[in-house]
């Protein structure tokens, strides 16, 4: 008995390793089952091996489950189903379909407009849209998914149909007539010549399918059509038979590109919304891909040409379309990199992520982390205000002791979201694996919340030096622990290897790197003397090097004054500092005569730049705050909630009973969000903490953090980096 069991085990193991002695193809309908059985018979009569068996499922999703459960082996799926099968069940694509020799195993989803219009990808809100059909790949899934993923379209509560109906100024989406939003989504549809079949997902609707969506645009019903890359060329320049297209010329239409530009309809390879992968045969990870391809390759060699007894790539005999394989398939090819991510490609993957929102799996609450009594009060009012407006998911407020405690609780799944500053975003991402879900946008002229850190010098050809020659120079800093004056420049110099602290003593290392400095601090008595050497105190010479306005070289303007008056050679300040104190903007005697053109910036690449070139020549950009969540949280639902909420509560003068970006009613500042916030914004492509913070800021931060010593930390989480240094114990520094 034991030998028989061992033999059976070996047999099953060999069967699994070799992909089994037969291939069980899963079908999703009766017609497909019939075609599969005919293909099985044709293969058998031709002597093809292994044997092909047919297993009938109820749908493509059901077939995927059967394959995962080892009750079937293979099925052909479209891109969206491949994504789900790979992500949820670990299936892999092994054989791809080829439709067009020019583009191979893919085609392209494009957005088409009339050349005479001024529509771009950034101005689609409010325009009229034409779609091939509801849930169609290029007409719905890709454009809607792309708009959501890029942050152009916000979706609350996973209600994609509602979001689209409110985003466009009317649409024709054949098949949307049975939805709650048919008034908007079917507004442009016309039906057939007798007015029948309006908004049907069938040829009864004249604007259905690729040609129909393009006709919707061509006839002026819509402003943009979401179609395939070949649609325009197939229906213009005399290539179309229907009368509506006889006079159309391809040169009268253009494509919308992802970067906001437009291009000729022939330039679809670089101007498109996404490359759409061809359908592919998927199997379990343990299935021999070579065996599957060899069987299908022998099959297509015998049964893909006219006159053969069985037609692999035709469904006409069964009264259906695209059974087992797409009817437009020219050939099947093996897939080299057998992962769903590689097959689908980044553009299509991003579009699918934008659509991955199941209302039935949406948590009823978003648990927000709060850190103080005033913040608890504001969060409670926010929860009530959101609930009254039926915003989803609802807000729950959960207290924590510190930003780091919030991060721990979010990672553990006990809390869902918290707004953090730049340094804490770095910790949340690097240590706890959190990701940004939304960010804060400050006013364009906001000089305290969004700025670049720059190194300013005098324009002097006789004494010109670069960032590589800072050693031995005299430096001016707004204050110890300030982001622009200390954390970023010192962190950058450490990261670049110019400053090399010993035994974590950054203060001494900075003092030795520069010849002399002015770095105002709260308690200069316990401080390296070289860091106060350039400070001058007040008009009477008192309060020298103190971290307040009594020191004339304190703050950004003070550090710039230190440079102006010749005390220092370089000033580390915000990019706005030069303009605040030159060209008549500062009437104080020391600044009244200054001109901005007399100052330059030191660039990290060793060059110098004009003061107005700060965006390209800076040490780092201070990032805005961001809402951080777990990676398994749907960031589009978080932003969708905040975006809908700010329409109601974002204006500080709104009459709806709550102000998202104002904390004055709670006797606090920057509660839940910074009070300077103008709007919550989507993260777009900045989906990791590194992307959000930017490489220069991360480098500076990590340069500083590399000097942390165990047991040296005394500051509370969220404080500036330098309380971790032995000589700075006890200093209370402001956060970013």
From Swiss-Prot:
GO terms for cellular component: early endosome; extracellular space; plasma membrane; recycling endosome; side of membrane. Residues 1-19 form the signal peptide. GO terms for molecular function: metal ion binding. It is found in: Cell membrane. The keyword Secreted does not apply. Fe(3+) 2 binds at residues 451, 625. CDD domains: PBP2_transferrin. Its main location: membrane. Residues 23-357, 366-706 form the Transferrin-like domain. Keywords: Cell membrane, Disulfide bond, Glycoprotein, GPI-anchor, Ion transport, Iron, Iron transport, Lipoprotein, Membrane, Metal-binding, Repeat, Signal, Transport, Zinc. GO terms for biological process: iron ion transport. Pfam families: Transferrin. Fe(3+) 1 binds at residues 78, 107, 210, 279. Residues 712-736 form a propeptide. Hydrogencarbonate binds at residues 132, 136, 138-139. Involved in iron cellular uptake. Seems to be internalized and then recycled back to the cell membrane. Binds a single atom of iron per subunit. Could also bind zinc. This is Melanotransferrin. The gene is MELTF.
């Amino acid at each position: 008995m034991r030998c028989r069991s061992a033999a059976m085990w070996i047999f099953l193991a060999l069967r699994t390793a070799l992909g089994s002695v037969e291939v069980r193809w899963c079908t999703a309908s009766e017609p497909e089952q019939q075609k599969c059985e005919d293909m099985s018979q044709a293969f058998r009569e031709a002597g093809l091996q292994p044997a092909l068996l047919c297993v009938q499922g109820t749908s493509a999703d059901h077939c995927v489950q059967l394959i995962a459960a080892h009750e079937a082996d293979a099925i052909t799926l479209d891109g969206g189903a491949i994504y789900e099968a790979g992500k949820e069940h670990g299936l892999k694509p092994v054989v791809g379909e080829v439709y067009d020799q020019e583009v191979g195993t893919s085609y392209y989803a494009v957005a088409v407009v009339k050349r005479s219009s001024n529509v771009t990808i950034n101005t689609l809100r409010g325009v009229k849209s034409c779609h091939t059909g509801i849930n169609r790949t290029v007409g719905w899934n890709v454009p809607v998914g792309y708009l959501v993923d890029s942050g152009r379209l916000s979706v609350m509560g996973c209600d994609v149909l509602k979001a689209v109906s409110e985003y466009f100024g009317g649409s024709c989406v054949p098949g949307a007539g049975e939805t709650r939003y048919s008034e908007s989504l079917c507004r442009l549809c016309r039906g057939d010549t007798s007015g029948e079949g309006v908004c049907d997902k069938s040829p009864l609707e004249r604007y259905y399918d690729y040609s129909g969506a393009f006709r919707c645009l061509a006839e002026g019903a819509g402003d943009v059509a979401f179609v395939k890359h070949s649609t325009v060329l197939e229906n213009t320049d005399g290539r179309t038979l229907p009368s509506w297209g006889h006079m159309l010329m391809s040169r009268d239409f253009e494509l919308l590109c992802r970067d906001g530009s437009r291009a000729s309809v022939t330039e679809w390879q670089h101007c498109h919304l996404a490359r759409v992968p061809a359908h592919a045969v998927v199997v379990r990870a343990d299935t021999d891909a070579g065996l599957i391809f060899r069987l299908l390759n022998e099959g297509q060699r015998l049964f893909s040409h006219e006159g053969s007894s069985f037609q692999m790539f035709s469904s006409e005999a069964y009264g259906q379309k695209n059974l087992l394989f797409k009817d437009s398939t020219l050939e099947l090819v093996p897939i080299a990199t057998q992962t769903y991510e590689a097959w689908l490609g980044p553009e299509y993957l991003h579009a699918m992520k934008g659509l991955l929102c199941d209302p039935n799996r949406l948590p009823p609450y978003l648990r927000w982390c709060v850190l103080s009594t005033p913040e608890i009060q504001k969060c409670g009012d926010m929860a009530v205000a959101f609930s009254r407006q039926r915003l989803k998911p609802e807000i729950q407020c959960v207290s924590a002791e510190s930003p780091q405690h919030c991060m721990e609780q979010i990672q553990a799944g006990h809390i869902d979201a918290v707004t953090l500053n730049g340094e804490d975003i770095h910790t949340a991402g690097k240590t706890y694996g959190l990701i940004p879900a939304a960010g804060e946008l400050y006013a364009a002229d906001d000089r305290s919340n969004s700025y670049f850190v720059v190194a300013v010098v005098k324009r002097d050809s006789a004494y010109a030096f670069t960032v590589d020659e800072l050693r031995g120079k005299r430096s001016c800093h707004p204050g110890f622990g300030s982001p622009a004056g200390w954390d970023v420049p010192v962190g950058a110099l450490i990261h670049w290897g110019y400053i090399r602290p010993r035994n974590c003593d950054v203060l001494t290392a900075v003092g030795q790197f520069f010849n002399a400095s002015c770095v105002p601090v709260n308690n200069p008595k316990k401080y390296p003397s070289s860091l106060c050497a350039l400070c001058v105190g007040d008009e009477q010479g008192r309060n020298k090097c103190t971290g307040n306005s009594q020191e004339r070289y304190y703050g950004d303007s003070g550090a710039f004054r230190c440079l102006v008056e010749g005390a220092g050679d370089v000033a580390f300040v915000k990019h706005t500092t030069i303009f605040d104190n030159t060209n008549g903007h500062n009437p104080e005697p020391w600044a009244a005569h200054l001109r901005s053109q007399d100052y330059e910036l030191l660039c990290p690449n060793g060059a110098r730049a004009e003061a107005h070139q700060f965006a390209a020549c800076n040490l780092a950009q201070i990032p805005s705050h961001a809402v951080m969540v777990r990676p398994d949280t749907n960031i589009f639902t978080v932003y969708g909630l905040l975006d809908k909420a700010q329409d109601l509560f974002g204006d500080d003068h709104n009459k709806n009973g709550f102000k998202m970006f104002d904390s004055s009613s709670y006797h606090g500042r920057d509660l839940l969000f910074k009070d300077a916030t103008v709007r919550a914004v989507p993260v777009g492509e900045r989906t990791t903490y590194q992307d959000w913070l930017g490489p220069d800021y991360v480098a500076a931060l990590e340069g500083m953090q590399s000097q942390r010593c165990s047991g040296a930390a005394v500051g509370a989480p969220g404080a500036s980096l330098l309380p971790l240094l032995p000589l700075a114990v006890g200093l209370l520094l402001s956060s970013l």
